Amino acid sequence: VYIINHAEDQYVFLDPDFWPLIEQVAPQCTGVKGWVVMTTAEHMPETAVSNVHCYEDLLAGQASTYECPAIDENDACALCYTSGTTGNPKGVLYSHRSTVLHTYATMMPDSMNISSADVVLPIVPMFHVNAWGNPYACPVAGAKMVMPGNKMGDGPTLAALINEEGVTMSAGVPTVWLNLLAHLRSSGQRVETLQRVVVGGSACPLSVMEEFDTYGVDTRHAWGMTEMSPLGTSNSSGARRHQFDADSFAAIRTNVGQPIFGVEVKITDDDNK
């Protein structure tokens, strides 16, 4: 409720599964002109809330082309709110320029390494720091992007989706990968097309990385912040593992890596020196 009102949102797009929650908070969101449910007419919820729209009905009959207006590169592009801070969430406003620069940086080989040959599955939601930039990087690179929906917490469903869509790269928090690996371990199933996973949000256990090794999957540990669009560092040491002995490589691969292009890092001690 706070974010909707603070951002002065006029239209809110939502998954049908969130409708029970929306019915509770809608009366408190007085600035919202319309609630757009991302579904077809037959799956629309029955509700007494006014100004509810069906996404597919809104699209029906509309032109298939769109003439984009001229936009200054420094104009506002997107607004994303932090969630892990104390106090109220804080909005971070991105310009078109910063978003494009971040997109180029995330596509680089030592970052997420996204190209037109990839099928990308961002398990991290778009409200979690812009799905780590994947919704921007995929169309720029020409990669196929698979939208997982909201039922990706269990290993069997995730493994099935990876195999059905031929996913080559995926991004998510450690819990997601723990669930996937537990399923693969117990079922004997494999994810043959998966080449790399990007892990962030919290520290990735070495055991997860080493188990992914047995499936031929490169694990990349990354770090970022909402204020950084969000990617700040990426660890691509897996491509250079032949340069290290086993113990050294284990220590190196668990850190969050090096700053990506455009990021400046200042390291200080407890005395700010």
Regions from the PLM with identified roles:
Residues 1-24, 90-93, 122, 144-151, ...:
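Short beta-strand->loop structural element characteristic of the AMP-binding/adenylate-forming
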Residues 100-119, 129-168, 183:
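Conserved AMP-binding/adenylation subdomain of ANL enzymes
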Residues 69-71, 250-259:
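Short Gly/Pro-enriched turn/cap motifs at secondary-structure boundaries
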Residues 1-60, 71:
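Structural core segment of the AMP-binding/adenylate-forming
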Residues 62-74, 79-121, 133, 143, ...:
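Conserved adenylate-forming
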Residues 140-143, 167-172, 178-251, 264, ...:
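Gly/Ser/Thr-rich phosphate-binding loop
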Residues 12, 76, 82-85, 120, ...:
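Conserved S/T- and glycine-rich ATP-binding loop of Class I adenylate-forming
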Residues 33-41, 220-227, 257:
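Beta-strand->loop->alpha-helix junctions that form or flank phosphate-binding loops
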